[in-house]
């Protein structure tokens, strides 16, 4: 079990800690809770749905990588499938602050990479910043998304972001987490690069058409993917590398275990992720080889 999760267990109510420990000790635990597991925890602890989600936030925050701020934030989103996904903020020493991943972005992209097509609610340690409110406004469920904070009544995202600006204002009907396949192909025969291309085909980039995906290979051969999550307000967009880093972190891997990376993006786009991807990987480890393909 992740050492930080063990530490976080000590901050939970004793009955909850006892109930969740076997789940976290399971070798197949992937930083998610199935609907059945969550229902069992509700029955065992006699907590309400929102109380249980808030009580589990220290576990989500245990995944935080915050060497700069030392401000550890956790988030839990529930997909339309009923499964709960943990997420946490991530910061990178030596990279610009624009490369930072917020906890809300982490949990949402975690759910996205595992196949969810909608989010019903999100539970967070602290009130979501404007950046994250805008990021969430890109979701397929932005109009109905519920936000839960500790010791607060739940509110909708639209209450946190009144008179919001979103995809519809730019005449865009696609939304983040929507099912899509851009049909990009590459001449490369390398399987690792092909995995990055597959991720690019599921990316959300209706504004620039920069369909892009990243694959990261760990030292043990495990591969993690990320796909670009673009935003109507541009700046809150989440690059494909960041989504892959979330995927890797939530699987319990340290970022020092990255052995290889690949970036595939649309060749005729008005933007490129190459420079930022190179710079951030360089900050993590200058020896990580990066394969780049413009399709």
UniProtKB/Swiss-Prot annotation:
EC number: 3.5.4.5
GO CC list: cytosol
InterPro entries: APOBEC/CMP_deaminase_Zn-bd, CMP_dCMP_dom, Cyd/dCyd_deaminase_Zn-bd, Cyt/Deoxycyt_deaminase, Cyt_deam_dimer, Cytidine_deaminase-like, Cytidine_deaminase_bacteria
GO molecular function ontology, one term from the record: zinc ion binding
Organism domain of life: Bacteria
An example Gene Ontology biological process: cytidine deamination
Active site: 104
Residues annotated for Zn(2+) binding in this entry: 102, 129, 132
Cofactor: Zn(2+)
Note describing how the cofactor binds: Binds 1 zinc ion.
Keywords for this protein: Hydrolase, Metal-binding, Zinc
CDD domains: cytidine_deaminase (cd01283)
Membrane-crossing residue ranges in chain numbering: none
Catalysed transformations (reactions): cytidine + H2O + H(+) = uridine + NH4(+); 2'-deoxycytidine + H2O + H(+) = 2'-deoxyuridine + NH4(+)
A Pfam family reported for this protein in Swiss-Prot or TrEMBL: dCMP_cyt_deam_2
PROSITE patterns for this protein: CYT_DCMP_DEAMINASES_1 (PS00903), CYT_DCMP_DEAMINASES_2 (PS51747)
Keyword Zinc (UniProt): yes
Domain (CMP/dCMP-type deaminase) ranges: 48-168, 187-295
Cited function: This enzyme scavenges exogenous and endogenous cytidine and 2'-deoxycytidine for UMP synthesis.
Family membership noted in the UniProt record: Belongs to the cytidine and deoxycytidylate deaminase family.
UniProt-recorded name of the protein: Cytidine deaminase
Chain's gene name: cdd
């Amino acid at each position: 079990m992740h050492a930080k999760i063990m530490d976080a267990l000590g901050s939970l109510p004793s009955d909850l800690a006892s109930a969740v420990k076997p789940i976290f000790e399971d070798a197949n635990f992937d930083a998610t809770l199935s609907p059945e597991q969550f229902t069992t925890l509700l029955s065992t602890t006699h907590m309400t749905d929102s109380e249980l989600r808030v009580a589990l936030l220290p576990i989500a925050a245990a995944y935080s990588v915050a060497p700069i701020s030392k401000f550890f934030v956790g988030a839990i989103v529930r997909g339309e499938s009923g499964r709960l996904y943990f997420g946490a903020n991530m910061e990178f020493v030596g990279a610009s602050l624009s490369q930072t991943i917020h906890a809300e972005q982490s949990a949402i992209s975690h759910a996205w990479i595992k196949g969810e097509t909608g989010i019903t609610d999100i539970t967070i340690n602290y009130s979501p910043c404007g950046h994250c409110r805008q990021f969430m406004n890109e979701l397929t469920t932005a109009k109905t998304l519920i936000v839960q904070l500790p010791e607060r009544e739940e509110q909708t995202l639209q209450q946190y972001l009144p008179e919001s600006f979103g995809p519809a204002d730019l005449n865009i009907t696609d939304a983040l987490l929507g099912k899509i396949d851009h049909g990009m192909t590459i001449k490369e025969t390398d399987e690792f690069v092909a995995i990055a291309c597959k991720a690019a085909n599921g990316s959300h980039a209706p504004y620039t058409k920069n369909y892009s995906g990243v694959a990261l290979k760990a030292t043990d051969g495990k591969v993690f993917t990320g796909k670009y999550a673009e935003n109507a307000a541009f700046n809150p967009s989440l690059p494909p590398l960041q989504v892959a880093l979330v995927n890797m972190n939530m699987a319990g891997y340290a970022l020092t275990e990255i052995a290889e990376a690949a970036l595939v993006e649309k060749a005729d786009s008005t933007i490129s992720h190459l420079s930022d991807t190179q710079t951030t990987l360089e900050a993590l480890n200058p020896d990580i080889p990066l394969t780049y393909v413009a399709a």
